UniProtKB/Swiss-Prot annotation:
A motif (SUMO interaction motif 1 (SIM)) lies at residues 26-30. Residues 163-199, 246-387, 625-655 are annotated as: Disordered. Residues 381-872 are annotated as: Interaction with SLF2. Forms a heterodimer with SLF2. Interacts with SMC6 and ZNF451. PANTHER family: FLJ44216 PROTEIN-RELATED, SUMO-INTERACTING MOTIF-CONTAINING PROTEIN 1. Residues 163-181, 292-313, 369-384 have a biased composition (Low complexity). This is SUMO-interacting motif-containing protein 1. It is found in: Nucleus, PML body. Residues 1-367 are annotated as: Interaction with CTBP1. Residues 459-872 are annotated as: Required for inhibition of CAPN3 protease activity. One of its GO terms (molecular function) is peptidase inhibitor activity. Residues 467-802 are annotated as: NSE5-like domain. Residues 628-655 have a biased composition (Polar residues).
Amino acid sequence: MAPASASGEDLRKLPTMAEVNGEQDFIDLTRETRPRTKDRSGLYVIDLTRAEGENRPIATLDLTLEPVTPSQKEPTSLQTCASLSGKAVMEGHVDRSSQPTARRIINSDPVDLDLVEENTFVGPPPATSISGGSVYPTEPNCSSATFTGNLSFLASLQLSSDVSSLSPTSNNSRSSSSSSNQKAPLPCPQQDVSRPPQALPCPLRPLPCPPRASPCPPRASSCPPRALSCPSQTMQCQLPALTHPPQEVPCPRQNIPGPPQDSLGLPQDVPGLPQSILHPQDVAYLQDMPRSPGDVPQSPSDVSPSPDAPQSPGGMPHLPGDVLHSPGDMPHSSGDVTHSPRDIPHLPGDRPDFTQNDVQNRDMPMDISALSSPSCSPSPQSETPLEKVPWLSVMETPARKEISLSEPAKPGSAHVQSRTPQGGLYNRPCLHRLKYFLRPPVHHLFFQTLIPDKDTRENKGQKLEPIPHRRLRMVTNTIEENFPLGTVQFLMDFVSPQHYPPREIVAHIIQKILLSGSETVDVLKEAYMLLMKIQQLHPANAKTVEWDWKLLTYVMEEEGQTLPGRVLFLRYVVQTLEDDFQQTLRRQRQHLQQSIANMVLSCDKQPHNVRDVIKWLVKAVTEDGLTQPPNGNQTSSGTGILKASSSHPSSQPNLTKNTNQLIVCQLQRMLSIAVEVDRTPTCSSNKIAEMMFGFVLDIPERSQREMFFTTMESHLLRCKVLEIIFLHSCETPTRLPLSLAQALYFLNNSTSLLKCQSDKSQWQTWDELVEHLQFLLSSYQHVLREHLRSSVIDRKDLIIKRIKPKPQQGDDITVVDVEKQIEAFRSRLIQMLGEPLVPQLQDKVHLLKLLLFYAADLNPDAEPFQKGWSGS
């Protein structure tokens, strides 16, 4: 079929085509008495969106025709449109009697329900202007609508069935009938209309435009239509009919609130929410509809404030831009809509002042304050409990919760508060600690990675690669130029979860920078931080570790006493031991023999290394600054590292004490690892305790021995050491195993083997003996409840299953036994000292009695309690 031209002769052929299709009436658009202007292509344009008078009828849109693709908006023949739609596009009178229609009365106007059900309204479409043979989209209007199907309704334009002709002779006679039977109003004329194309109200419903005059938006012929998407669900909307194009039609005050003029504007190519009025039947549907956060962006340029927007007196929440701000209907997180002070008009007394600090990251837990006017606040009946909303997962921190509770309730804002999910984030640290069956590890400086986040879990699947050659060349250049600070800084930037440094580079950092005697404090700290980062991202194992026991011995012996990075290196060594032990324990529980700790600290393989650690520990304890060493060691002010000096022996004793305390803690951690690396912790602890016994007897002062026992991390090892000391101090050794009965036996049969500071204060010797018995009872409780006698491989299952410890031989003591032994010990002390007990010693004896009671789960009556205390 040849395309028709725009001339009048071709349009006269239109009745012939209608007759071929079996239809008799036609519309003759050539009988227009009013002069028409031509556009650039020489075609006559008839703009049906403009009203010439009250006698002109309002043409309606028949949406029942088959849609066409958006590509057919261009000036083509009407025959092309007719071929796609299956019937004539323009016709004078259509007999609708043969078509069954479902009607209902809305606002005293009949409306076809098939129009409401078959079309989903998304946003503002361009209106249409009909030329001789073409359909042109024109500029959008304040009451225009966009239909689903990519603007395919443009080919479905049809005059109303009650309008037989648009000629001047029939205008007056047909005006009343056409106005009463119209399906949908055409866009209202643009008079003093200020509407951005992106922020339009509900389709097919006239709303008051802002009282602000501005030029009309550009024509749709020059601006391509926006690509909008909408959900598959159909949102129903009422279609009030108009008898004539309104100049200013107010919204009817119903229970259905109309959206204000500051509705959300959606940018192009961004899927958004359907910009339509929410009716009561739709609100119930939206309450159960999940929404993904972050899908409704809002910018200040897309919002046109209008304080004159009508508000609903109640019954439904206020809907700014079709986003429901109500904790009962549709709460949403701060990541959904980003408000700025310019987006929302300020109402005094109703809204808090918003600043830039109110824009929060969506990952942060926070409260949501939805701004709404008092007239639009939800009724108590419409509020829904927040826990019923399945998609809301806003976490609330305790600090934020206190703030929200302390703030008074404002009438214009609704605070969205959520409950912390049970068994959620707060249980993760507990579960994480279960992975470490000993005490918590020596913490990284990057301690937040103890609980791996989402990025860390995702990075585990990526392939590891060495640092690229070009970047590595920059590092080697700084090494050749002897610029250690540049080397460290380059590596700090280049090391990442995907890229690891070569082994020789790590060895250079340890030996040439960290253990260098000429580097500054800042360079040493940077080198240590770099090693910690490498250890965090790429933990060393038995094959990749870059230190050995020979290097550690050199640093801890006399030769390394003057190295300023001595303590930092020891911390790095302990960190590598701890990380590798825990990694092996979590991933390959049966392969602890392949860990670094098993290679260097096993009592079966390397007992001399364990003896070295004990020797370094006792040396650090005896030189902890409480007594000045004879060689007068002191520390540098910046690093806390020992330096040899023959003058000023009493300078900076606190720094010396702190340095040695750090060394003591690190060495005690190494011993606790040595207890666990072998299959039987009991055998390992017995061997280490035998090695340690002679060194403990050589500790000269009580304060140093107290430091030695209180810093010991392994409770099993402390029990074994104290047991050996008490066994050697008894005149008649006992065959009882480590138990409560054995502790009672030590109470009345042991004497102190440890050196006393002065012979004049003999009661202090007994005071220390009672203190050691307290240490023994306390550690014994840890051994029983934490299953420390079992292998670390089996300990996890015992803890998770909450298996109670097995009763030990000698733990079945009674209240009478405890009372009898305590009274005998008091009598013995008075006899040995020749004087009444001092208050300090009395308190410790009473505390020992309570520990025995609670250790045996005994509940003594009040009489023996008072009797025992009075006897003291």
